[in-house]
Amino acid sequence: MTTVRTRIAPSPTGDPHVGTAYIALFNLCFARQHGGQFILRIEDTDQLRSTRESEQQIFDALRWLGIEWDEGPDVGGPHGPYRQSERGEIYKQYSDELVAKGHAFPCFCSAERLDEVRAQQMANKETPRYDGHCMHLDPAEAQRRIAAGESHVVRMKVPSEGVCVVPDMLRGDVEIPWDRMDMQVLMKADGLPTYFLANVVDDHLMGITHVLRGEEWLPSAPKLIKLYEYFGWEQPALCYMPLLRNPDKSKLSKRKNPTSITFYERMGYLPQAMLNYLGRMGWSMPDEREKFSLNEMIEHFDINRVSLGGPIFDLEKLSWLNGQWLRELPVETFAAEVQKWALNPEYLMKIAPHVQGRVETFSQIAPLAGFFFSGALNLDAKLFEHKKLSPDQVRQLMQLILWKLESLRQWEKERITGCIQAVVEHLELKLRDAMPLMFAAITGQASSVSVLDAMEILGPDLTRFRLRQALELLGGTSKKETKEWEKLLASIA
């Protein structure tokens, strides 16, 4: 009997996302329930955005939740390497095989030509897709151009008509027309694979039997299915999980909800409660109980109990469930958990240099730096009264800074300062006009340690959470203002 093998394959391009943990949990439960294995693979072919720091954060966040893997970059295994950036020669071998079989072709089209083709197709109300310009190039001519060092990608061929039947474990057979599919790039000009080729090759070579992934990948499933067909490989069973949603039913995003696992760790949620809550996202225990452990979920796990309705990720419900877990802890365990959270040595070492020179006794630390150990703050609207700016201008300035910070990929003091500076200069203001508002939103005080240092230490999700909290206190942003201010944001360098 074939051993069930599932996997999670996150990209190390930012803070570890709750959506990653959600999909990892269901892959883990499915594998364990069937006596199988769960693999962690790192999809780091985006060399510009991928970092080892983000990779380590993924490891740490999943382990904090209690999610462990049988094979992966840090634990090894018989199917390594488990980082896609270390498997380049493997992908090239299989890309060359597809070209040799006539299932793929080198494409030399420039970005300018592709833009022109797509613009013309859109003007004609056609689906934008590659027009096959290089598909019928003479193979000898293509090889001559490659040998001469001409920049190119490798594209897969796809049918131009008919439908692809996608067998989904949750939805049954899903029919997707082939004319919606583009001739997908498989190998980029830099010699690295795209998601589609790497995904299929790795899943096959690593013996993955079941793929549980987010439903946002369902529309592109025909490309993956066609690649399995081209290689002559058995396709793993496919299961497209419902996406996590905000309370307003929109896709979970950092604009409306903190999405980083590290945010919830820093806020003082128990990992057991967080995992329990993620387990209730679109799934329920047979007896409908709300509180259950990972082992209990594995014992009773049945993929057919997954509901296709978009599960709502609601902070209030998560907090309620966390409270249930906290209240059932023995007092000694509760005290130990508080100590582990509040007196985290690594976190304290980040804070200590900014506090040590400003206090004369330890008792002065809490009033000065207590905000480092809080989640939501009790804000006073009077702190946002500005000598120079009207209330509307205050909201606009803070909203633009929040949006600008949302686009920041590397959370460092200099880059945070640069974001704020860019906004204030565009509004013809000074940095000193914004800093009192930042102090108020981030620390809940008129003054404290350097607010820029505080923002770096608190991290992106908690910083943005507090800015959103302050904006809500000041009345929020109307739909009309959002439209107008987003246009303004686009013009800020």
From Swiss-Prot:
Keywords: Aminoacyl-tRNA synthetase, ATP-binding, Cytoplasm, Ligase, Metal-binding, Nucleotide-binding, Protein biosynthesis, Zinc
UniProt key word Hydrolase: no
Residue ranges annotated as motif 'HIGH' region: 10-20
Residues the record lists as binding Zn(2+): C107, C109, C134, H136
Keyword Cell division appears in the UniProt entry: no
Signal peptide region: none
Binding site for ATP: K254
Cofactors required: Zn(2+)
GO cellular component: cytosol
Name of protein: Glutamate--tRNA ligase
Organism: Ectopseudomonas mendocina (strain ymp)
Lineage, highest ranks first: Bacteria, Pseudomonadati, Pseudomonadota, Gammaproteobacteria, Pseudomonadales
